[in-house]
Amino acid sequence: MKLRISDLEYILVTPIRAVARILALVFVFVVYIVQLWMLALKQKRLASDLLALTARLVLYAMGVRVVISVRDKSLDESKSRPVIYLYNHQNPLDVFVIQGYLRVPSITTAGLHLGLVFPWFSKSALNAGHVLMDHLNTSSRGSAMYKSSEILRRYGAIIIAPNGSLKTTILQRVSASAWVLARKHNACIIPWTFAYENLKISEEDLYNPFKILVSRIMARPSTINCYIGRSKDLDLPSDPRDREGFSRAVKLYYREQQESD
């Protein structure tokens, strides 16, 4: 049985890649600990910046490259109004993209899981402006909506995954929470699309950050491509009470994005 050149390269490169990623992960935790220290010293801005650096380093250590593509002048339309970004949440690593690259407050359930790997992650995320939520708890979901209003007033922007869960795609479910929030604050709604290359994570590992870290040590390099659309790309209903119309418009947009890939 003959080995292909690509297989031989994989065999030779994998051990080197694994060692490099382990060393990078050690540095990740050093930066994260310094971030906690800054948080304890009330250096909140610096702590937030260090959390963003941690997020970037985590992706680097796992062999994940992030490519941000801004089409035309998509960001210009949000300058005069608050903005609510939507995105198709399909991968547990999205939280690191948002914190490390987009630098936008989000509604996230990451606090339920990342604390297993990053101690006091919830406190770090709250300091960075994120709204923590337990999507299985009705009270928590209601509280998240209230806090989202506060974040939108304070920061002028927030990013929301309308599908709300890694196990439910945006083509299956779209919550109207972003629509309600936008009407309340006269906010502009702009969609992000995340596309993943060589980054499949098994369903049983979606909420297990430790297993994901371990599995990525020897995995082939991957890419997350992030594309921003325009507010006018969403054919949103004129009636602010039309939640179903909002859901249909968002599903249609992401279906078209999926078909164009």
PLM regions with names:
Residues 1-6, 68, 72, 77, ...:
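Soluble, non-transmembrane catalytic domains of enzymes that act on hydrophobic metabolites at membranes
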Residues 2-84, 93-97:
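Membrane-anchoring hydrophobic helices of lipid-metabolizing enzymes
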Residues 88, 138-142, 171, 243:
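A conditional alpha-helix N-cap/helix-loop micro-motif detector
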Residues 120-122, 168-240:
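A cross-family acyltransferase "interaction/gating" segment
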Residues 148, 157, 164-166, 170:
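Soluble extracytoplasmic domains of inner/organellar membrane proteins
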Residues 32, 36-41, 77-138:
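Catalytic core of membrane glycerolipid acyltransferases/transacylases, capturing the structured
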Residues 82-84, 155-161, 188-190:
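Residue-level preference for the first positions of well-ordered beta-strands
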